[in-house]
Amino acid sequence: YGANLRGANLYGANLRGANLYGADLYGANLRGADLRDADLCGADLRDADLPDLTFVILGEKYFISITNGEYVRAGCQNHTVEEWRKYSKQEIAEMDGRKALKFYPRLLDIIDFYIGKGERPDWLTSKEYADEVTE
């Protein structure tokens, strides 16, 4: 927890699955780094040089990061953008119950904003879903 990588040159580094929870990456060069499945929750990324289309979104119900415009981590779940867009209601519910079901449209809004508009599952517009999340 909290590794000091301030100003480190991690250009092209394979950080896939790395636990960078709480790491100090202030000013680090992460261009070209493979950050898929990396845990960046609580990491200090100020002035870090990140790969294209890489974002850390704070202030949501879950920690959210988008890596290389391809992978999205929400809480402890890390999947491709396409996988997130196609999940069934049951698959989302299995992640974190009703809380995840309520948050899922917001997550898709975030993905749409940062990556571009995409498909949404039909079940999101069902009356059954609307009733379930407003109970």
Segments (PLM) and residue ranges:
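Tandem repeat scaffolds
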Residues: 1-62, 66-68
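N-terminal capping/linker segments that flank leucine-rich repeat
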Residues: 51-135
